[in-house]
Amino acid sequence: MENLKKQVGIKAAEFVKSGMVVGLGTGSTAAYFVEELGRRVAEEQLEITGVTTSSVTSEQAKALGIPLASIDEVDYVDLTVDGADEIDSHLNGIKGGGAALLMEKIVATYSKDYIWIVDESKLSENLGSFKVPVEVITYGSEQLFKEFERAAYAPTWRLNEEGEKLITDMQHFIIDLHIAKIENPQKLADELDLMVGVVEHGLFNGMVKKVIVAGSDGVKIISQ
């Protein structure tokens, strides 16, 4: 599995050229993309500016010598490469397993090009086998949790290693929704967008046109 992740990370790095502002995703697969960019910066004199999507990715990029800027310091991002937790047949996706969904969606929104890199196990006909993360402000979060219970979304709190409610980089909580089959991802996204106290959710609908997939038959690119 790790070899597959590395393959797509290296493949995605081929789309990066000198002079680009590059969005650096978060997660185990995106880490291989960042690692390959670091190698190219050191060995090939690749000149880029990275915009990171989490504190974890920032630390990795700094250690690799990749110059960084915040999303507010650039006009736009040329290309963002990130992983995904589940992707349906229409290239809608669920992200946020690494608790970085808010920053990931902000960087993706201001990117000219956006690519996901995954192994074939992340592909599904319909979304729902992976939980839907919902980032919420701490105040009133228990009320939101009850709302999700009433909607039969089987909510659970995202916890840290100490068993306490996880605090995101943006100082929010995450409530994970466990919905067996999401028939209409956009309808669910619209519903969540209208809920007071919800900061962002992990449904990334219609945001990517290209997915790089590694599987038993090699690396392929799926385009929409």
Curated annotation (Swiss-Prot):
**What enzyme category does the UniProt record give?**
isomerase
Q: Which keywords, in A-to-Z order, does the entry hold?
A: Isomerase
Q: Give, as in the UniProt entry, the pathway in which the protein acts.
A: Carbohydrate degradation; pentose phosphate pathway; D-ribose 5-phosphate from D-ribulose 5-phosphate (non-oxidative stage): step 1/1
Q: Which GO terms describe its biological process?
A: pentose-phosphate shunt, non-oxidative branch
Residues bound to substrate are 26-29, 82-85, 95-98, 122
| UniProt GO molecular function | ribose-5-phosphate isomerase activity
The protein's annotated catalytic reaction(s) are: aldehydo-D-ribose 5-phosphate = D-ribulose 5-phosphate
Annotated EC: 5.3.1.6
Query: Where would you find the membrane-spanning parts of this chain?
Result: none
Q: Which SUPFAM superfamilies did the record assign?
A: D-ribose-5-phosphate isomerase (RpiA), lid domain, NagB/RpiA/CoA transferase-like
Q: Name one Pfam family in it.
A: Rib_5-P_isom_A
User: What positions constitute the catalytic site?
Assistant: 104 (proton acceptor)
- Keyword flag Acyltransferase: no
> What biological function has been recorded for the protein in this entry?
Catalyzes the reversible conversion of ribose-5-phosphate to ribulose 5-phosphate.
Question: What's the subunit arrangement here?
Answer: Homodimer.
Similarity section: Belongs to the ribose 5-phosphate isomerase family.
Protein name listed in UniProt:
Ribose-5-phosphate isomerase A
From what organism does this protein derive? Lactococcus lactis subsp. cremoris (strain MG1363)
Classification lineage: Bacteria, Bacillati, Bacillota, Bacilli, Lactobacillales
